[in-house]
Each structure stands twice: as C-alpha cells, then as structure tokens.
Swiss-Prot record:
This is Translation factor GUF1 homolog, mitochondrial. Pfam families: EFG_C, GTP_EFTU, GTP_EFTU_D2, LepA_C. It is an enzyme of class 3 (hydrolase). Promotes mitochondrial protein synthesis. May act as a fidelity factor of the translation reaction, by catalyzing a one-codon backward translocation of tRNAs on improperly translocated ribosomes. Binds to mitochondrial ribosomes in a GTP-dependent manner. This protein may be expected to contain an N-terminal transit peptide but none has been predicted. It comes from Arabidopsis thaliana (Mouse-ear cress). GO terms for biological process: positive regulation of translation; translation. Keywords: GTP-binding, Hydrolase, Membrane, Mitochondrion, Mitochondrion inner membrane, Nucleotide-binding, Protein biosynthesis. The lineage of its organism: Eukaryota, Viridiplantae, Streptophyta, Embryophyta, Tracheophyta.
Length: 663
C-alpha cells in the first residue's frame, strides 16, 4: 500500500506541474523565452487557428488596394535578401529572425544558396503620402528562382502578377538571366520596376549599370531605384514605387468566380495545397469548385493567404493571391495553369501556360534493387512538390527496374536527386543524361528517342536521317575573354548569331548550340575559362539535322544498356575513349580478366582491359617435376576462362557518377 500511495502522490504532483507549465506557456505565448518551450512540447506558436487574435479581414482590401508583384533577377543578385528586408519592413517577419533567405525553405536551397521553388508572401503596408492620411495596401510578393533551369518556375509565377522588380547587381551589372527574365516579364505585359542592388559594395558602379539598363532594355534611368538589401539603404523607396507604378489587378468582383492555379505542393496532413490567383469573383470556405482541365469537383476545406506561413482567412477576393485546400491527394489532379471556377457555373477558361518541355532525360534506379518500391513511393511524393519532372517506369538488364525521368536541365536533375536523398533517404544510380533525338529509318518511319537503349540496333532498320534539339544561347562576358569563349562555342558545334558590345568592357554573344553539347559541362567550362565572370542563359530552338550514332559500351562482349549513349559521329571516338578510361579506373579487379569496349554497331572504336587478380597456385609446390606445376597453371587458366564466360562484372555506383561528367 505504501508504494502505491507514493506512486499516486508522485503522479498527482506531476500532473499539477504539467498543468502549471502549460498554463504558463499559454499566458506567455508572446514571450520569446516561452515560444521555444511551447514549440518543444509540440505546439505551434504560429498557429492562426488556435490563436485568439482576430482573423485577417480581407474585405478591407478591394482590388485597387492590392498589388501583385514578383522579384526577378540573375542568380545571386540578392532577390531573396531583398524579399527578407521587405517582409521585415512590413512586419510580416520579425527583424533578426535568425533565418536568412526566409522564403528559401528547402534544405537544398539553403545548402546551395539558390532559390529552386518560387514562394509567395502576403504583406500589409501603410503607404504614407504627404498631406494625406495613410492608406493600407495588401501586397503579394513572389520570390522566384534565378538559375536558367528554373525559368519555367519564373514564368508561372509571373502569370499571377501585374508587375516585377528587376533586380541587378551594382557590381556585376546586367547578366544573361537578367535578359531572359526581363523578356519573360515583358512578354507577360508586366510593369517593370528596375532596382540596382548591392550599392554598398566597394566595386559597385550604379551609373554603369544604369547605362546598361538603358541600352539593353530601353528603361528610363530616372526610374531606377538604388538600394542595398543587406544594409537596408534605400529600401524605404521600394514599396511606394510598387504602389505608384504597378497597376492593381484587373478583374470584376461581381462576375462568376475564376481562379488561376499557378503552383501546388503536397502536405502530409492536408493533401495538395493549391496556390491560386483570384481573377474574378470571390471564394469562401465551404464553396464547391471545379477544375476545368479534369472536370473534377471539390469542396473548399480551407482558404487563406501566405503571411508568410499558411494563414486561414475564410475567403479570397478579386485580385488576391492565396491558397486553397480541397482534400486532393495527388497533384496530377491539379494541373498547373488550370482554371478553377464555382461548380454549376459557366466561365471562359483562362489562357494558362505553355506545357513544360523537358530538356534532359536520365534513368533513375535504386542503388539496391530491392528498394524499387521505396524509390517509387519517394518519387511519387517528390513529384507532388515538383510537377515539372516527368516519370515513367523502365527496365534495364544491368540495373533492373527503374524510372526514366525528364528534367528542365542538369541542375534541376542534380537538385531532384539531392532532394530524394535528403528528404526520403533513398540512394539512386543515374544513367548518362540524354536529350530527345528524332531518327528516320529506311522504311520511312520516324522515332523520337529519349533512352539510347531503345534505339534499335537491327541492321534491317537502317537510320537514314537524324535530328537533334538546339538552343539559342545568350552569353554576357568581359571583352578580354571573348576569344576563349568563341573557341569553346566552336568546339561545341555552335553557330554565332550575334556579337555586340554592351559597353566598353562587356560583350553580348548569341549562339545556336546543340542541346546535347551544353547539358553536361558547358556551363562549368564557360565559368572556368572566364574566371567566373561570364553568365549564360538559353531558350528552346528548332531541331536541326545532325550525323548521330549510338555508342554502346561492352563488358566482356556484352552490351550494358545503362551505359549506352547517342553522340555526334565526329566526337564518337573521343567520348568512347573517355568512357572506357573512366570505367577502367572505377571497376574493381575481378578474379577474371575484364575487357571494356566502346562500339558503334559492330565496329569497336576503343578498348581497354582490367587484368585479373592472380592466385599463386604454385605456393605449395616446393620443387618436384615441372609437369606438376604446368598442370596446376593450366587448370587455373581453364577455371578463369569458365569464370569469364559465366561471371558478371559489378559496376560500382561511383563509376556511374563519373560517367555523368563525360561531355
């Protein structure tokens, strides 16, 4: 009884202690020291639902009090830092929040220092004008990626905006992605507000950059804002300029509901969360909505804004940007660019977007064949957050079951693999990246090939013509490196289209290049020969006729389908020799000899051999007849022949990784 009494007394005192702790936490939720404790016990200090604060009243912001704008720039010109400062200025996040680049939420974004996924934040701002009462505005900011591979992400984000801040580094000036993003915004009829950032740098030259903006884009230099997002210098002029220059969203509040779906992501608990821009009408929680592309109907379970986290508001009005939750379980039902409307109403669908065009294809296989199901689940979840990846199942005789994936570029592919590893713990093997080719055969049929292994080697189907995709590449660089860059482009089978001077120090080059020549190491090579000063961007162009051949890699006479690639005939020998050398360096020695060959059809163009490990079978023969030793050596030789005939060669994961780097 004594022990039971003590246990009961201890339990009672523990309950009292927990009750006091939680009461204290609830009464001090705004206290910074208590917020950490509150979160440690599994409560969210940012939960708008459980907070006693009144919900945000969006009816105070008619469309004329709304501005939707995006920040666009070349990579590393300070987009995300500027977004941080603007959110601090409006009180959306606290100053010194301890998380630089707040909108870069992915681990891969923080590690690489780049923006991969466009993010949205709603800000509330009191605009004070002289001799007038302060007026409240709702500002929707969209931070976009800067790398060429994610230009599709930028174009989607711009569709929800009426204006854009074009940010340019005061030291580096106009770069290739600055040009590309400017024309994306220009084609979308957005109002462009030029911003020169990093004016606090010792090498900053704002006047030179102003002249570049004038010569390249015909922008008025009087309209350029000079700021430093790092120190806050000049930031007080940015939001007033947004309000004055960028028009409010067009739209009719009395019209039937029409919303543009411009992005989506998957949440483990809520399902698919859709980012929408309300073009006409209004949406309330509980409404029934339909998706024009699929025809599916759903009930709106939650609706709100990003402030900067998901904040439920119960409604969205004309011109506003926010999110909706419908209980959807897969993003395949939420097609980007789709029109969402109220069920049982008839509306004119919105224009939407161009379909995504995949530039690079690669096979993705589990490092351990037994992990195929786990890899499938991981890829299904990840593609819910990255709808620009195409996935189809495929089988390889060397690697087993896997997936053929289409990506927007090599960085996109690299980021996808890194996210698979970091977010889902899966180890994968990637095959050589290829681009989609078109082949015509002797019987007149045409075939588009994304996987080299799918190209028939049957002599009956002789290839009579072939075409490869090309791109229009834009390169901006210092004039002293022009010769080296022209040589690089010529080596990559490029055709020069334009050569102009931006100013006395910088040159603008435009080339038509085969896509295959730039997907692997062109950007790295360009940065290397220009000491990192060149910038590069490209856009799709037409297919052009080319002399293409299928290059097979054979191990002991057996073709390995996962190592096959398609190359230009002029480069076949060099690529084959390089592949053979890399495989020799990374395949471990076996008990039998391994012959590595590169072949075009039946013609061997490169060969090397990995010698066998040799066991000393004569170790125990201390003298005796020489015929005994010869007999043992012959027996060993026959065994190695038999082993070579039936043995399999293990190709390590590192070998596949190195082969990816062969241009």
């Amino acid at each position: 009884m004594g022990s039971m009494y003590r246990a009961s007394k201890t339990l009672k005192s523990s309950r009292q202690a927990l009750s006091i702790l939680f009461n204290s936490l609830n009464s001090n939720r705004q206290n910074p020291t208590c917020i950490g404790l509150y979160q440690a016990y599994g409560f969210s200090s940012d939960s708008r639902q459980s907070s006693k604060e009144p919900t945000i009243d969006l009816t105070k912001f008619p469309s004329e009090k709304i501005r939707n704008f995006s920040i666009i720039a070349h990579i590393d010109h300070g987009k995300s830092t500027l977004a941080d400062r603007l959110m601090e200025l409006t009180g959306t996040i606290k100053k010194g929040h301890g998380q630089p680049q707040y909108l870069d939420k992915l681990q891969v974004e923080r590690e690489r220092g780049i923006t991969v996924k466009a993010q949205t934040a709603t800000m509330f701002y009191e605009n004070k004008v002289e001799d007038q009462e302060a007026s409240g505005y709702l500002l929707n900011l969209i931070d976009t990626p800067g790398h060429v591979d994610f230009s599709y992400e930028v174009s989607r984000s711009l569709s929800a905006c009426q204006g854009a801040l074009l940010v340019v580094d005061a030291a580096q000036g106009v770069q290739a992605q600055t040009v590309a993003n400017f024309y994306l915004a220009f084609e979308a009829n957005l109002t462009i507000v030029p911003v020169i950032n990093k004016i606090d740098q010792p090498t900053a030259d704002p006047e030179r950059v102003k002249a570049q903006l004038k010569s390249m884009f015909d922008l008025d230099t009087e309209d350029v804002l000079l700021v430093s997002a790092k120190t806050g210098l000049g930031l007080e002029h940015v939001l007033p300029a947004v309000i004055e220059r960028i028009p409010p969203p067009p739209g009719i509040s009395e019209s039937p509901l029409r919303m543009l779906l411009f992005d989506s992501f998957f949440n483990e608990y809520k399902g698919v969360i859709c980012y929408v821009s309300v073009v006409d009408g209004m949406l309330s929680k509980g409404d029934k909505v339909s998706f024009a592309a699929s025809g599916q109907s759903y009930e709106v379970l939650d609706v709100g804004i990003m402030h900067p986290e998901l904040t439920s508001t119960g409604m969205l009005l004309t011109g506003q940007v926010g999110y909706i939750v419908t209980g959807m379980r897969t993003t395949k039902e939420a097609r980007i660019g789709d029109t969402i409307y109220r069920t049982k109403t008839t509306v004119e669908p919105l224009p939407g977007f161009k379909p995504v065009r995949h530039m690079v294809f690669s096979g993705v296989y589990p490092a351990d064949g037994s992990d195929f199901e786990a890899l499938g689940h991981a890829m299904e979840k990840l593609t819910c957050n990255d709808a620009s990846v195409s996935v189809a199942k495929e089988t390889s005789t060397a690697l087993g079951m896997g997936f053929r994936c289409g990506f927007l570029g090599l960085l996109h592919m690299d980021v996808f693999h890194q996210r698979l590893e970091q977010e889902y713990g899966t180890q994968v093997i990637s095959t050589i990246p290829t681009v989609p080719y078109t082949f015509e055969y002797s019987d007149g049929s045409k075939l588009q090939v994304q996987n080299p292994a799918a190209l028939p080697s049957n002599p009956k189907y002789r290839v009579t013509a072939s075409w490869e995709p090309t791109v229009i590449a834009t390169i901006i660089l210092p004039s002293e490196y022009v010769g080296a860059v022209i040589n690089l482009c010529s080596d990559r089978r490029g055709q020069q289209l334009e050569y102009t001077f931006i100013d006395a120090q910088r040159v603008f080059l435009k080339y038509q290049l085969p896509l295959r020549e730039i997907v692997v190491d062109f950007y790295d090579e360009l940065k290397s020969i220009t000491s990192g000063y060149a910038s590069f961007d490209y856009e799709d162009a037409e297919y052009q006729a080319s002399d293409l051949v299928k290059l097979d890699i054979l191990l002991n006479g057996q073709a390995v389908d996962a190592l096959a690639t398609i190359v230009h005939k002029q480069k076949a020998y060099r690529v084959g020799k390089e592949l053979v050398e890399k495989l020799k360096n990374y395949i471990e020695r076996q008990m039998f000899e391994v012959m590595i060959q590169a072949a075009i059809g039946s013609k061997i163009i490169a060969r090397d051999t990995i010698s066998a490990m040799r066991k000393n079978v004569l170790a125990k023969c201390y003298g005796g007849d020489i015929t005994r030793k010869k007999k043992l050596l012959e027996k060993q030789k026959e065994g190695k022949k038999r082993m070579k005939r039936v043995g399999s060669v293990d190709i390590p994961h590192e070998a596949f990784q190195q082969i990816l780097k062969v241009s």
